[in-house]
From Swiss-Prot:
Allosterically activated by GTP. This is Uracil phosphoribosyltransferase. The lineage of its organism: Bacteria, Pseudomonadati, Pseudomonadota, Gammaproteobacteria, Enterobacterales. GO terms for molecular function: GTP binding; magnesium ion binding; uracil phosphoribosyltransferase activity. Keywords: Allosteric enzyme, Glycosyltransferase, GTP-binding, Magnesium, Nucleotide-binding, Transferase. Its cofactor is Mg(2+). Catalyzes the conversion of uracil and 5-phospho-alpha-D-ribose 1-diphosphate (PRPP) to UMP and diphosphate.
Length: 208
């Protein structure tokens, strides 16, 4: 599995600000979107382009355009919605697919409860977004759903990832690509990432 930890100074700075315990909902939400945008920039660096001719201000001019690669952004409810706007800033024509998976706090197992995928997802590259890759259960369950629907090109974008989650994802889906702003220390006894960001969903939606 291709694993990319994005170490750009802007990414590290913004993620560092997100780790502050008393950060406001507004600021956390803004930063989640901004880091999501920067991760998208890196994750889409291998998109193919083609040369086309358009009419410029002084006559015909050749330009580079992305070569017909359709994209669907797949936020995992609910926290993934916090990164979606930043992703769409870079790929505004992308369609949106939504998957709902929550983690049972006792068993730590993923429980799928909702999915609404674009009809031609088999023709699209999926950018799956979720702030945290902890145990990997929710992400694996989401990718299971996408592959069952025919999606063959999948990239995962997360703000922070635990080594345990990375290992589980690689074992389940070695063909996907992972882009993260940080590979953190690991999980505590409750399955939360250390140092992590706390509960990203609560911080994005202000439901502490």
């Amino acid at each position: 599995m291709k694993i990319v930890e994005v170490k750009h100074p802007l990414v590290k700075h913004k993620l560092g600000l997100m780790r502050e315990n008393d950060i406001s909902t507004k600021r956390f939400r803004e930063l989640a979107s901004e880091v999501g945008s920067l991760l998208t920039y890196v994750a889409t660096a291998d998109l193919e382009t083609e040369t086309v001719t358009i009419e410029g201000w002084n006559g015909p001019v050749e330009i580079e355009q992305i070569k017909g690669k359709k994209i669907t952004v797949v936020p995992i409810l609910r926290a993934g919605l916090g990164m979606m706007e930043g992703v769409l800033e870079n790929v505004p024509s992308a369609r949106i697919s939504v998957v709902g998976v929550y983690r049972d706090e006792e068993t730590l197992k993923p429980v799928p409860y909702f999915q609404k995928l674009v009809s031609n997802i088999n023709e699209r590259m999926a950018l799956v977004v979720d702030p945290m890759l902890a145990t990997g259960g929710s992400m694996i369950a989401t990718i299971d759903l996408l592959k069952k629907a025919g999606c063959q090109s999948i990239k995962v974008l997360v703000l922070v990832a635990a080594p345990e989650g990375i290992k589980a994802l690689e074992e389940a889906h070695p063909d996907v690509e992972l882009y993260t702003a940080s590979i953190d220390q690991g999980l505590n006894e409750h399955g939360y990432i250390i140092p992590g960001l706390g509960d990203a969903g609560d911080k994005i939606f202000g439901t502490k």
